[in-house]
Amino acid sequence: MSQADLLDQDPVFQLKGSMLAVTILELAHNDLARLERQLADKVAQAPNFFRDTPLVMALDKLPEGEGRLDLPALLEVCRRHGLRTLAIRAGREEDIAAAQALDLPVLPPSGARERPLDIKDSAPRKPAEEPSPSAGEARPEPAKAEEKPAEPVSRPTKVVKTPVRGGMQIYAAGGDLIVLAAVSPGAELLADGNIHVYGPMRGRALAGVKGDATARIFCQQLAAELVSIAGNYKVAEDLRRSPQWGKAVHVSLSGDVLNITRL
């Protein structure tokens, strides 16, 4: 076997699944001038959050009758404010065609991935008929299955005992995340369930990243760059206005509003 053959057998890449936190900008109106002004206000509040932020542009909630969307101009508005569009989420043919012309990936509309199963099977077989009882013969009543109460679903918990340094990202897939030390600025905590930080929380904490609105965040000292539950977030500039800044807090979601209460 030649050296070239040996090199061909040595893989040069791997395909891996990953759960990444990506911001979704859900466009509510086709008004780029107003979008520019409102984005500028947001960037002024949290410039670090918007610097080179990966983004999915959601166009599937745009109301009908607002005219054709200028997608290249929309992407340029986002680019000027530090948002890097990775893909769009759209359902209208004209938006999909515009994205394809820009070689931009298109994701299905919100909820389109969850469809009822289309079972194309033959008609169900009829159960075999039981012989009818003879006259005077009592038919035995079928025994009732004993109903057992549903067991509570336990979620796996990931426990981190060492400080989480800036630049580190820790993700608890399918469950809760518990950190028994400090979380530095620039660090990122993600969990499908709840997040508990038994120390100063100075980085980012994103709970319920797969959409669990019942997820909570608990920390001993709120000094976070960002807290988020099911995609609803507050950045440091918003958090500092809270009287709970620097204190032990509990963060929960009510509708689309984050509530921060003292522990």
Curated annotation (Swiss-Prot):
Region (Disordered): 107-159
Sequence ranges of Basic and acidic residues compositional bias: 112-129, 138-150
Coiled coil: none
Presence of keyword Lipid biosynthesis: no
Domain of life: Bacteria
Classification via Pfam families: MinC_C, MinC_N
Cited InterPro entries: CAP/MinC_C, MinC, MinC_C_sf, MinC_N, Septum_form_inhib_MinC_C
Single GO BP term: cell morphogenesis
Keyword list, A-Z: Cell cycle, Cell division, Septation
Functional summary from the UniProt entry: Cell division inhibitor that blocks the formation of polar Z ring septums. Rapidly oscillates between the poles of the cell to destabilize FtsZ filaments that have formed before they mature into polar Z rings. Prevents FtsZ polymerization.
Subunit-structure text: Interacts with MinD and FtsZ.
PANTHER family with a match to the protein in the record: SEPTUM SITE-DETERMINING PROTEIN MINC (PTHR34108:SF1)
Family, per entry: Belongs to the MinC family.
Name of the protein: Probable septum site-determining protein MinC
Source organism per UniProt: Pseudomonas aeruginosa (strain ATCC 15692 / DSM 22644 / CIP 104116 / JCM 14847 / LMG 12228 / 1C / PRS 101 / PAO1)
